[in-house]
Amino acid sequence: MGERYFQDFDWLILLPAIVLIALGLLTLYSIDHVPAEFRDTFQPVKTGAFERQILWVLVGLVVMTVACLVPFRYYEGMAVIFYGVGLLLLVAVLFAPAVKGARRWIDIGGFNLQPSEFMKIAVIFMLARFLAEKRNRPDSFRVLVVGAAIVFVPFLLIVKEPDLGTSLVFLALLFPVMYWRGIDESLLILFMTPLLSALLTVFSATTTERGSYPYLLLLFFIVILVAAYRRRRDLFRSVSLVGLNVGVMLLVPMAWNRLEPYQQKRILTFLRPQSDILGSGWQVYQSKLAIGSGGFMGKKFLHGTHKLLAFLPERHSDFIYSVISEEFGFLGSLVLLVLYSIIIIRGLYLATKVKNRFASITAVGICSYFAFHVIVNIGMTTGLTPVTGLPLPFMSYGGSSMVVSCFLIGVLLNFSRRFYEY
């Protein structure tokens, strides 16, 4: 029994995750400590994140073990309950006390629980269960609408908190999972083009030096009209394609006015970071300086100057990648990306290997979760994406994120042990 357990165990998923957790703890330790030779010059700015994170890592490893041992059919059977409880928690958090102008946490016995993190698991399971049912044909428009509803209900509740960054994760889960299930590409385009229309409209409406953005928006709309004309035999889809995009272009300015001021500032800072270097663009500016100053080999462990000077207020959470790049350089950053890539690629390979449809779809959802978090977080620290507050899995300080990431790794390991089950 023991030999069979380890024979089917996918170490290429587990080992990179363990190494990432260890690197995260080392970085958090570095943030709170100053080398002896610098103590006369720098005073450590204690966050206490390292000590607390050790506790969350231990909890996460226990959760990972349990997730690996429980028969995965339990997840499929409990998906509806997980989803329902998650929605109730998201509603409950709207009535919780506001922290820094947002309602994202529920205080349970001195610990802050972030329901939106756990809702990501529930949405992955619920989507996988719905799409795995044989009666739900992938070429059905109804399947796409119901699948989108599963995602958009929690999406809207999380936007209400407000937490725009976390809400975008749910959209990132939808399209890869739908594509993997075999949903008609034209139906996916029908849902994806409004998002692109919204982005181009935001660029056109918020950029003072507009340049080519209005022309890009016009060109994109012409492409939509041409696509609709080419599919004129399917009148419903053609009308829907044009109608959705026109509606989005008209609604985006209204939605912009309903955003919180800090959300508008983050988007504007992303579009023009140089316009407010000493204000909202400070973290991104300092993050890029820290990453660049690390060079190829880095400044060595504990010797990051931006960290020592506390130029990055969120260096233990959102901008932890900047500390890693400064102290371990390009080489350390590359190792980090390779470790994440191994987990994601191995997870996708597992999705093709596993016999059970629910398990296959869930594996793709988990890989999408990790890929989106890594791309957005690193993009945020390098100025390629807006500051969203998404954590770097296994690395950033935070109990909810650590436990969820460990749980999802445990689920992948579960699938690898039972890949032959239908």
Listing of model-derived features with the role each one plays in the protein:
Residues 34-38:
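Juxtamembrane/transmembrane-helix boundary motifs at the membrane-water interface
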Residues 5-7, 143-144, 309-312, 354-355:
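Helix-boundary and loop/linker segments of multi-pass membrane transporters
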Residues 3, 10-12, 16-19:
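N-terminal topogenic module of multi-pass integral membrane proteins
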Residues 1, 377-422:
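A juxtamembrane structural motif centered on a specific transmembrane helix
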Residues 1-6, 42-44:
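Cytosolic juxtamembrane amphipathic/interface segments immediately preceding
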Residues 269-317, 328-332:
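TM-adjacent membrane-interface loops and short helices in multi-pass inner/ER membrane proteins
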Residues 168, 173-187, 306-328, 391-392, ...:
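Interfacial segments of multi-pass membrane proteins
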Residues 16-22, 27-28, 39-279, 325-382, ...:
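Hydrophobic alpha-helical transmembrane segments of multi-pass inner membrane proteins, especially
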